[in-house]
Amino acid sequence: MLKTLRILVISFLILLPNTILYAEEINKPGVASAHPLATKVGYEILAQGGNAFDAAVAISATLSVVEPYSSGLGGGGFFLLHDSSSMEDVFVDAREKAPSNANRDMYLDNDGNVMRSASLDGPLASGIPGLPAALHHVSLDYGTMPLYKLLQPAIRLARDGFPAYERLITALLVAEKSRTLSPKFKEIFMPDGKPPVVGQIVRQPELAKTLEVLASSGHTGFYDSFFTQKMVEESNQDGSIWHLDDFKSYAVTERAPINISFLGAKLTMAPPPSSGGTTIATILNIISQFDFMGMDSAKRAHLITESMRRAYRDRAFNLGDPDFVDVPIDKLISMEHAKELAQSINLDQATPIHEDDDIDGKFALNEGAHTSHFSVLDKNGNRAAVTQTINTWFGSGYMLPSSGMILNNEMDDFSAKPFTPNRYGLVHGEQNSIEPNKRMLSSMTPTFIESDRGVAILGTPGGSRIITMVLLSIIDYFNGGDAQSMTASKRFHHQFLPDVIRHEKDAFTNDVKEDLQIKGHNLQEISNYGNMQVVTFDNATGETESSSDPRGLIEGFEIDFY
């Protein structure tokens, strides 16, 4: 039975305006994910009477099976949830943790240089997984259906298989040439010594059994059982430093989201250990100091770039796990701080790198197609924005033999050595150094927008570029964009170091590129990136629109979603 969504005037934080949402009812739910099979599962759960949180659990588990290069039970994620009955938002932090045996210099050689492959390949690169804990927690605390039922679609797809598709095959070809892949990984995904062909059925029987353990025994079955002991033994035999107590002590953490006001709307975003919310808040606060909406395209691009530069510098020097370090969130997202940063921007010239910022190192900014995001809105107005990951394509490249889980390589998201760039060219300071049981900094940025127009639920994969992709989609929304334009619009990125604007083809006109270069910007055209997933709801019409990024569309699945 449809329930009418009537949202009264709510007073948020003092810094936020009162926002009135006046929809009569939500005519249909919305689901957007990176794989058609996961989207189908989400709609099926909603059709069975489940809420957005039930659907989120089922979608998350399904993506762990059918999109194994992006996320999985061997990784972690962030769940941004909105409960329409209580009007409360919560951020469920299921980020991986460093093992208790981890130490600050574990990826340095005898000369103090970073051994990059050690934090990328094999089980030594793996943090303690958090996604299974999140599935149990979200289902138990926010869902209406039993976890056992929610995991059945993923179990079937792992056991019975799904057709291989171009994106999976491409990821396997790249991994085969560039990564060290474990024997069990090759057995599952390259049974004939090579990747499957399109349409060939991919089965993961051990992963199906792992999902069954989680479905029947929940958190305890995964984190404190004979199953856990077997995982630890296998990974340690191949080089990890896991301890059984690392799993027994793992728990998700609920945190207050980052909330800011922008152009009269409320933005709800991910807090640390995500760097997304604070970084986007800083950028939007900076550009709000100018007549941003009245600028021409060239001035806008320059201002956004200069704001990105400053916000990413803040990220490098200030952010880390808030349970371990003092993160000055209130200062970073304050208007006073934004005004100070805005005053340092010259609208006619790019900011040269200060000599203190010219940190030694090669800043290889790798392509960002990793990680996965999905967005859900149910008919009662509950919503979920979920980003989950194992870091790079296929994580560490190591699959646990008995459980069929691909382990993450999230330890590379720590600062192995302060201000030495990681896989994504990002630099971090002491705040993000390795410590036992610490969560590594992340760029994942699940986001809600609430305005007088309605609601938008969004997020994307893309490594260090996640933040700027979400930022540009937010700006597109305020320019009148819809779900399709938010996923399809062209992108550009600056992350403080390296000092270059990386942009998709046609992100700028020739005139804008010339203007930016005259101002002193370095430009580099790159291939398309990201896989934005957006659901919007229009207050005036009650209509829902779901859109998946055309850059990541998976073909070959004829599915009627709704």
Task: Identify the meaning behind each predicted range.
Residues 438, 470-471, 479-527:
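Extended C-terminal subregions enriched in glycine
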Residues 24-40, 44, 52-224, 228-271, ...:
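Noncatalytic scaffold domains of N-terminal-nucleophile
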Residues 290-389, 402-403, 418-419:
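Internal maturation/activation junctions in enzymes
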Residues 254, 368-371, 393, 442-444:
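Short, small/polar residue-rich loop motifs at catalytic or cofactor-binding pockets
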Residues 65-82, 86-91, 241-243, 383-451, ...:
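Active-site rim segments in enzyme catalytic domains, especially the processed small/beta chain
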Residues 277-292, 449-456, 463-487:
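M16/insulysin-pitrilysin zinc metalloprotease superfamily fold
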Residues 8-18:
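Bacterial N-terminal signal peptides
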